Swiss-Prot record:
Annotated source species: Zymomonas mobilis subsp. mobilis (strain ATCC 31821 / ZM4 / CP4)
Protein name, entry field: Leucyl/phenylalanyl-tRNA--protein transferase
Gene encoding the protein: aat
Family of the protein in this entry: Belongs to the L/F-transferase family.
GO terms for MF: leucyl-tRNA--protein transferase activity
An example Gene Ontology biological process: protein catabolic process
One Pfam family linked to the record: Leu_Phe_trans
Localization terms from the record: Cytoplasm
Length: 268
């Protein structure tokens, strides 16, 4: 048990298939978990339903990356009707916020009417992304966030999306359950080159892709961004490529929903 998590220890734990949890958001105690069965979602086997594809193409949500990591983790930790407590306690929150500041933890945000209504966060190490938690305050927001995450991982050459535990929700979108032995083989393949040559998947590749401009039902990200009065826009001096100095890339011409559907491939 410990109430402090060193970021280097946390990354080393991920590299060996272990991650932290707690029994309650009200405690400072943390324990380490190594499941006998592991949930993963192979990026090339994401199940995109026709209904979800339609929602994504409509660009109902403005989807961003790394724009409000702390808000995402706080909303993931909030109790809900289905989940009255959370394992995201103060030491775990602090550890992942520190990883985010170091460039290892990332978030996906879904905005609707200027409100953060869905999202997820996780850890990037090598060619692996370890999904930690997601939330949704309106229907389909977390599904849209996951779809955008998978598209980002595909174009960034990631090979492993770790879901930790399988759920019916994740299984419906392509997640599978594998043995610990199988998982460790995949994990080694995904992270070993990081420790030898610092090779890693490219989190920002997606932001450099242009939207499908022929989609008449979609607003471009440039127009969405200009029209939106979002918390992260205040005080941000955008450079010519749409990147805020010192922050993760967010191009004004990054993909719209039509391009995300195209990147995800076959609709099931």
């Amino acid at each position: 048990m410990t109430n402090m998590i060193d970021p280097h220890l946390l990354l080393s734990a991920y590299a060996t298939g272990i991650f932290p949890m707690s029994d309650s958001r009200e405690t400072d105690e943390v324990y380490w978990v190594e499941p006998k069965k592991r949930g993963i979602l192979p990026p090339d086997h994401f199940h995109l339903s026709r209904s979800l594809a339609k929602i994504i193409r409509s660009d109902r949500f403005l989807v961003t990356a790394d724009r409000d990591f702390e808000a995402v983790i706080d909303l993931c930790a909030e109790p809900t009707e289905d989940r009255p407590d959370s394992w995201i306690n103060p030491p775990i929150r602090a550890a992942y916020c520190q990883l985010h500041n170091l460039g290892y933890a990332h978030s996906i945000e879904c905005w609707l009417d200027n409100r953060l209504v869905g999202g997820l966060y996780g850890v990037n190490l090598g060619y692996a992304f370890f999904g930690e938690s997601m939330f949704s305050r309106v229907s389909n927001a977390s599904k849209v966030a996951l779809a955008w995450l998978v598209a980002r991982l595909k174009v960034g050459n990631f090979s492993l999306l770790d879901c930790q535990f399988i759920t019916d929700h994740l299984a419906s979108m392509g997640a599978i359950e594998i043995t610990r032995e199988d998982y460790l083989k995949r994990l080694k393949s995904a992270v070993s080159s990081y420790f030898t040559d610092k090779e890693t998947g490219n989190w920002n590749t997606l932001d450099r892709l242009s939207p499908l401009l022929h989609n008449k039902h979609s607003k471009t990200k440039e127009n969405q961004f200009a029209d939106a009065d979002l918390p992260f826009t205040e005080g941000i001096a955008l450079e010519t490529d749409g990147t805020a100095p010192g922050e993760a890339s967010f191009s004004l011409a990054c993909p719209n929903g039509a391009r995300i559907v195209q990147l995800l491939g076959q609709i099931s």
